[in-house]
Amino acid sequence: REIIAEKNPDLKDKEDVAQKVGIGAIIFNDLYNQRIKDVTFTWEKIHSFDGETGPYVQYTYARAASVLRKTGITEVGEIDPSLVTDETSVALLKEIERFPEVIKVAADRLEPSVISRYVMGVAQSFNRFYHENQCNVEDQKLKEARVKIVILAKQVIKDGLDLLGIQCPEQM
């Protein structure tokens, strides 16, 4: 609760967000590691917004939702692929494209850590994309292309976390 209040004092539904993040942190920590490995559990680590944690992934989802709110675009049709050739955009799109195969591998191995580690990779790729690509730009075609990437990343993060039983707050 304190972390959420500190990060965003004006946030509505602080209690609901804190509950989603707290429960999600525990689930993510448990499912991030392979089932047959011993894990050291510390509250400080699992509640951190830095590193390979559930709150980091949930915060990334909320960041993507914020980008969409700020651009005012919620849907984008086909885009011109020549507009998204920078390294971070391509890397993120390649990561997103792997989602169906990741689900298959996780199911075949009965190993949820495959999904949690994949979702972490998408979150990390998205954050690199976010830091290098402004979405709210004048060029409407470029804006739509970048927003499309945000929409796709947000959806994959949500779907991956849903499979793990973790809820995604729209704001944090």
Describe each PLM feature range:
Residues 1-172:
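Non-catalytic interaction-recognition regions
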